[in-house]
Amino acid sequence: MAENNKKSTAYIQRMRTLKFYQKMASARIPITVYLHDQREVKAEFGAIDSSESKLAVSNLQTDWGVINRAVIRTGDVVGIEYNLVQEEGEL
């Protein structure tokens, strides 16, 4: 019984995570990515791979200019800052 409860909880958590990523990708949410080298870059969230090891972004603002599309390794990321607008009826 406890094993089924753990699986159910894991399923619910995974579905929440997927819905979160889906909402961010569909809204093209502007993000600030904080990197290990104490840099921060701004971009628009595009997608994340299933192992959550690569972050796809667009309009990546760097010291060298704006890169239309890029992939950031999540191992290089310290944190990501974003604002989500709550839709009516959401908790």
Swiss-Prot record:
It holds the Pfam family Gemin7. Residues 18-86 form the Sm domain. Disruption phenotype: Inviable cell population. GO terms for biological process: spliceosomal snRNP assembly. GO terms for cellular component: nucleus; Sm-like protein family complex; SMN complex. The keyword Cell inner membrane does not apply. Coiled coil: none annotated. GO terms for molecular function: RNA binding. InterPro entries: Sm (IPR047575), SMN_gemin7 (IPR020338). Keywords: mRNA processing, mRNA splicing. Belongs to the gemin-7 family. Part of the core SMN complex at least composed of smn1, yip11/gem2, gem6, gem7 and gem8. Interacts with gem6; the interaction is direct. Interacts with gem8; the interaction is direct. This is Gem-associated protein 7 homolog.
